[in-house]
Amino acid sequence: MAQEKVFPMTEEGKLKLEEELEYLKTVKRKEVVERIKIARSFGDLSENSEYDSAKEEQAFVEGRITTLDNMIRNAKIIEDEGNSNIVSLGKTVTFVELPDGEEESYTIVGSAEADPFEGKISNDSPIAKSLLGKQVDDKVTVQTPGGEMFVQIVKIS
């Protein structure tokens, strides 16, 4: 039997996934079923774009429910390792890009809760991979799709 994939995440990230799952199961699923009922009332299903659209949305919602359920069931909560001097999963790292000194901060999380717009990057991302295990004042070369970037870590929290 194949081993299930483990999804490292923070407690906060797991809670957000649980909230989304609950919403999909209790609200969105019912809305989609109602849309399907209404679309069926329009008659001929072979040329009924409302019905097709509602069925596509239903497939998406059910797929997302399955995905979220799997991620939550196989979640591994990131424990605080106690050492705030080393970049690790769950830590927020602030660095300056060299030589211009532009400061950036990211929290390194598991891929299930990554959201770059909220400053949360996946531990599988090029930036995170380069920073993991490093310490304050370390200078790091980061390989990105746009080329190399040189940074210096200024804070870990």
UniProtKB/Swiss-Prot annotation:
Q: Give GO terms: molecular function aspect only.
A: DNA binding; RNA polymerase binding
What are the entry keywords? DNA-binding, Transcription, Transcription regulation
**Gene3D superfamilies recorded:** Transcription elongation factor, GreA/GreB, C-terminal domain (3.10.50.30), Transcription elongation factor, GreA/GreB, N-terminal domain (1.10.287.180)
Question: Which family does the record claim for this protein?
Answer: Belongs to the GreA/GreB family.
* One Pfam family linked to the record: GreA_GreB_N
What the entry lists under InterPro entries is as follows: GreA/GreB_C_sf (IPR036953), TF_GreA/GreB_CS (IPR018151), Tscrpt_elong_fac_GreA (IPR006359), Tscrpt_elong_fac_GreA/B (IPR028624), Tscrpt_elong_fac_GreA/B_C (IPR001437), Tscrpt_elong_fac_GreA/B_fam (IPR023459), Tscrpt_elong_fac_GreA/B_N (IPR022691), Tscrpt_elong_fac_GreA/B_N_sf (IPR036805)
Q: Which organism is it from?
A: Bacillus pumilus (strain SAFR-032)
Identify the NCBIfam families for this entry: greA (TIGR01462), PRK00226.1-2 (NF001261), PRK00226.1-4 (NF001263)
GO BP: DNA-templated transcription elongation; regulation of DNA-templated transcription elongation
Which gene name belongs to this protein? greA
Q: What is this protein called?
A: Transcription elongation factor GreA
User: What this chain does, per the record?
Assistant: Necessary for efficient RNA polymerase transcription elongation past template-encoded arresting sites. The arresting sites in DNA have the property of trapping a certain fraction of elongating RNA polymerases that pass through, resulting in locked ternary complexes. Cleavage of the nascent transcript by cleavage factors such as GreA or GreB allows the resumption of elongation from the new 3'terminus. GreA releases sequences of 2 to 3 nucleotides.
Q: Which PANTHER family match?
A: TRANSCRIPTION ELONGATION FACTOR GREA
